[in-house]
Amino acid sequence: MNKELMASLVCNTVRCMKNRSTVPDKREPLAIPQAVLFDAYGTLFDVYSVALAAEQLFPGHGQALSLLWRDKQIEYTRLVTTSNHGAHYRPFWELTRAALVFAIKKIALTSITTGPEASFDQNFGAAVERLMNQYRSLSAFPENREVLSELQRLGIPTGILSNGDPAMLQLAVKSAGMDGLLTHVISVDPIRKYKTHPDAYALGEQATGLPAGRIAFVSSNAWDALAATWYGYQTLWVNRSQQPFEELGTLPTRTGSSLRAVLDFFPSPPLNEV
């Protein structure tokens, strides 16, 4: 290799390195969150804990029923939010019941023999009431109180930001023994728009008085974590069952296998910027 070519290569390499060093890094360090908001259903409260009761009522179909119930519940929230400017909005409790009735009807039509003259209520009314009562007081995940207590010790305001209507959330929090551990319990019901509508996520900013970028939002629902990330929150996806994340080109800020991963947002020893 001649000297002129060598000099040219060296010059180009230096120039390239110099230019690279002047390009700003878009991945700026994230500020320590000043508040933490949690999704409720699926994140703090185990929506599939109803599967045991469902299995007792519908032997051999409890797991399938609980999965279909949850999927249809979420589908209904999206349907009433996006259709006809929300004119068909119904409270979350009503949508939860409607989704359960659908799930039972689908399983009954394909798998369960019933009397041809009997109405749905005669055949399944008691089962609907039992499962809805179970949903009022869903099992909480075991690490909830530990994590919320630690955040409280750090002086970090916490809250729920949920599709659930106020009465549902109040009872769920009380049943889980989390009274006094949450600064805010925020329902989308007053705005009549369910997540993932941006107005639903804006409620977190309004309640805390903080911009989304200074709030950590925690959800076990990948679609919820994705939409919250798009909105501007720092996010934690709690991936308890080792599922893939949504394939839409955006990842959550953090991923963990339990609620304890939210504590990774805060240095140790804790440094509270509030």
Protein language model regions, located:
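Hydrophobic side chains within well-formed alpha-helices
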Residues: V50, L65, A127, M178-L181
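Short, acidic loop-to-helix structural element flanking the phosphoryl-transfer center
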Residues: W93-E94, T114-G115, N123-G159, Q170, ...
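Residue-level signal for well-ordered alpha-helical scaffold segments within enzymatic catalytic domains
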Residues: Q56, L68, A98, F102, ...
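Asp-based, Mg2+/Mn2+-dependent phosphohydrolase catalytic module
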Residues: M6-T13, M17-P33, S149-R153, L161-V274
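An amphipathic alpha-helix signature
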Residues: A51, S66, R70, W93, ...
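A metal-dependent, Asp-based hydrolase signature
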Residues: L57, Q63, Y76-R130
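Active-site neighborhood of HAD-like aspartate-dependent phosphohydrolases
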Residues: D25-I74
